[in-house]
Amino acid sequence: MGQVLPLVTRQGDRIAIVSGLRTPFARQATAFHGIPAVDLGKMVVGELLARSEIPAEVIEQLVFGQVVQMPEAPNIAREIVLGTGMNVHTDAYSVSRACATSFQAIANVAESLMAGTIRAGIAGGADSSSVLPIGVSKKLARVLVDVNKARTMSQRLKLFSRLRLRDLMPVPPAVAEYSTGLRMGDTAEQMAKTYGITREQQDALAHRSHQRAAQAWSDGKLKEEVMTAFIPPYKQPLAEDNNIRGNSSLADYAKLRPAFDRKHGTVTAANSTPLTDGAAAVILMTESRAKELGLVPLGYLRSYAFTAIDVWQDMLLGPAWSTPLALERAGLTMSDLTLIDMHEAFAAQTLANIQLLGSERFARDVLGRAHATGEVDDSKFNVLGGSIAYGHPFAATGARMITQTLHELRRRGGGFGLVTACAAGGLGAAMVVEAE
């Protein structure tokens, strides 16, 4: 066991997660069609503050993330402060760590709490796959800049004459890695082939995810942590996630064709996360500040770790890399955990990470560790379903997972939970949380 790194303030206070909330998650171009991420962020933070009954002036910092950036609101965090009636002097800044963005936001607020610069803050993220920054071609963009500098009409017309019809076509946001040109699904296909993960195994995990998420909603386990969203023109509120397929069968999954490697692939739309809209946020405080305000925390942040690997091959192994670090810093092992919540970007990615967490060879030859991190106990793993079922608004997923895990830990009488995710760019994140 390596060095334990206690997450406490100089006064010995633990980092308390007082409450958390999210919007329902909606598939692209459905219930939240036309609602930008900044509005989803304002929606969830405003409701979170209202439900907590914490005076807005208590919140000294807001760190928020958005992966699909909108040029008109580049600092989503500050816009949320200004749009929710919070104190205008509240510090606010935005972060981005791809699919681990709200992990980063939570870590940043925790670090401010440990440094003593604040005593309470909000962290979270929002993304919309329905409101996208549609751009222009590089050639058109350059011509437009030059036209703005041109002095005469003839100069402007000459510049425009260089354009062809194809240069005028809109350019949607890139779905591939900038450095490699590989799509996430291409990487998932790599991982399925590298680790011998079959189509049947992927479909079974996806089916499990949907079944458990549907059961969680049916049992009322998510009601406290998901708000009802009222969307213009306010005719039909959205109270639950709309991606969950509770009535599907394994035979339904088998009907879908591969989405990326269409000839030999096993990754389909059904065993991958869909493009999703939504927002999530949590309130963090020092333990003593929570006591002053008479608040009972959901739980505490015990440790966190971020990692990075190469992007050319099997880059979605973030959980296999970051989990041993987070456990080490928490002074725990896999057997100490009550719950494990892993982001399901793709079923293939999830199964590959599970395999490597239990691999002695991976631990020894790749991580340089004496022993495997530990086998993943299925009875502890994604017990309420995962991202394949709920959906994945990139910047919101981490806050969803942490809030969900803490509520479930409390229902089980407390314990430790691991929350972990892969992210674009070969990044990984893991956090250990504790509930009493």
Curated annotation (Swiss-Prot):
Main localization (coarse): cytoplasm
Active site, UniProt feature: 99 (acyl-thioester intermediate), 392 (proton acceptor), 422 (proton acceptor)
GO biological process: fatty acid beta-oxidation
InterPro entries: Ac-CoA_C-AcTrfase_FadI (IPR012806), Thiolase (IPR002155), Thiolase-like (IPR016039), Thiolase_acyl_enz_int_AS (IPR020615), Thiolase_AS (IPR020610), Thiolase_C (IPR020617), Thiolase_CS (IPR020613), Thiolase_N (IPR020616)
GO molecular function: acetyl-CoA C-acyltransferase activity
EC number of this enzyme: 2.3.1.16
Keywords, in A-Z order: Acyltransferase, Cytoplasm, Fatty acid metabolism, Lipid degradation, Lipid metabolism, Transferase
Protein's UniProt keywords contain Lipid metabolism: yes
Pathway: Lipid metabolism; fatty acid beta-oxidation
CDD domains: thiolase (cd00751)
Location relative to the cell: Cytoplasm
GO cellular component: cytosol
Catalytic activity field: an acyl-CoA + acetyl-CoA = a 3-oxoacyl-CoA + CoA
HAMAP family in UniProt: FadI
Cited function: Catalyzes the final step of fatty acid oxidation in which acetyl-CoA is released and the CoA ester of a fatty acid two carbons shorter is formed.
Assembly information from the UniProt record: Heterotetramer of two alpha chains (FadJ) and two beta chains (FadI).
Family membership noted in the UniProt record: Belongs to the thiolase-like superfamily. Thiolase family.
Descriptive protein name: 3-ketoacyl-CoA thiolase
Species this protein is from: Escherichia coli O17:K52:H18 (strain UMN026 / ExPEC)
